[in-house]
């Protein structure tokens, strides 16, 4: 092996960026169903929950899918299904924690952009709480997360009130030395 001379200066470390995209959607259960509506880790009162094996949090699920598109590790449909089957875990917070754990030690979350489409529930009053909860689970600053909400003018099933869908774009910084 060749020895590096002491006068040799290594280049500054480099950061590369990886971008993941995730999507998820779920249909509402009947209004009389007691399952709570959870979005971004926040319970929405007076709105039915979602048809799902888990708690149905489409925001956390879209984020998990965005992580999977960066890390190539299946969280939903893979690890989450296994956690449900073996331990009965339906809490999407646990799935999202597993997604964060799937990052390499050289990777960190830089930014998260989230768009939620649905006629109900009314999201605007809860957006700050949702951002705070996501920041807590991901261990990132609040200003690294933005959430927009739209009804889509009623053009889709989501905008007509049948369910909610979420899209997420995740930016990961990765430390590399060349």
Curated annotation (Swiss-Prot):
Annotated 4-CDP-2-C-methyl-D-erythritol 2-phosphate binding lies at 24-26, 150-153
Alphabetic keyword roster: Isoprene biosynthesis, Lyase, Metal-binding
Identify the enzyme class.
lyase
Q: Where is this site: Transition state stabilizer?
A: 53, 151
Q: Which InterPro entries does this UniProt record tie to the protein?
A: MECDP_synthase, MECDP_synthase_CS, MECDP_synthase_sf
Binding site residues for a divalent metal cation: 24, 26, 61
Its needed co-factors are: a divalent metal cation
This entry's comment on the bound cofactor is: Binds 1 divalent metal cation per subunit.
Q: Which GO terms describe its biological process?
A: isopentenyl diphosphate biosynthetic process, methylerythritol 4-phosphate pathway; terpenoid biosynthetic process
Question: Is Manganese there in the keyword field?
Answer: no
Superkingdom in the source lineage: Bacteria
Q: Does the keyword Lyase apply?
A: yes
- Enzyme Commission number: 4.6.1.12
Q: Which reaction does it catalyse?
A: 4-CDP-2-C-methyl-D-erythritol 2-phosphate = 2-C-methyl-D-erythritol 2,4-cyclic diphosphate + CMP
Could you cite one Gene Ontology molecular function of this protein? 2-C-methyl-D-erythritol 2,4-cyclodiphosphate synthase activity
Q: Give the record's pathway.
A: Isoprenoid biosynthesis; isopentenyl diphosphate biosynthesis via DXP pathway; isopentenyl diphosphate from 1-deoxy-D-xylulose 5-phosphate: step 4/6
Listed under subunit, the entry gives:
Homotrimer.
What function does the entry list?
Answer: Involved in the biosynthesis of isopentenyl diphosphate (IPP) and dimethylallyl diphosphate (DMAPP), two major building blocks of isoprenoid compounds. Catalyzes the conversion of 4-diphosphocytidyl-2-C-methyl-D-erythritol 2-phosphate (CDP-ME2P) to 2-C-methyl-D-erythritol 2,4-cyclodiphosphate (ME-CPP) with a corresponding release of cytidine 5-monophosphate (CMP).
Q: Report the HAMAP family cross-referenced here.
A: IspF
Name the NCBIfam families for this protein.
ispF
- Give the similarity note: Belongs to the IspF family.
* The protein's name: 2-C-methyl-D-erythritol 2,4-cyclodiphosphate synthase
Name the encoding gene, please.
ispF
